[in-house]
UniProtKB/Swiss-Prot annotation:
It comes from Coprothermobacter proteolyticus (strain ATCC 35245 / DSM 5265 / OCM 4 / BT). Homotetramer. This is Thymidine kinase. It comes from the Bacteria. The active site is at 88 (proton acceptor). Zn(2+) binds at residues 144, 147, 182, 185.
Amino acid sequence: MEIITQDGWLEVITGCMFSGKTEELVRRLRRAVIAKKETIAIKPALDTRYDLVAVVSHSGFSFNAIPVEDPKSILGMAKDAEVVGIDEAQFFTGELVPVIRELLQNKKRVIVAGLDLDFRGEPFGIMPTLLALADEVTKLHAICSVCGNIATKTQRLINGRPARYDDPTILVGGLETYEARCNLHHEVPGKTLTLFKE
């Protein structure tokens, strides 16, 4: 389901790397422009992989964007917008959550894209909160680079080997640093299994 109105609606597009999250965000933003909605895109300032002033998918789809360090500044930027797209939401601080809530109260349609899990296979940053608050969630999958099955995990590689559990969570990169993997082929040396108690 794709909503074209702007009545305080939060859409979250999530999944592992190379699943098409940014591509789907760009598609929805372009459709909003076609529907003559005032539309802006936001990206974290630290995401400088492909373009400083655009959200760009790994496959090359793009939409002009404003790089942001402080999530609170989004409120001023989005004052006249009906549709607000936010890419790589997992890189923003928790301050993004009240900003999104205020955008929704101001009847904006907010479309967020971000990784649900970090390279360790654990919930990433503010994404669990945004997924819980969302009116609509789209979970995308990639293809495992090892076996070709459905991939739901992001594998970080350092010199061609799986990154260790205790490596830093955030490392901006693309094909040179990450692969999509299925549960069977996702490796995190040093990770201990945690059993949940009821």
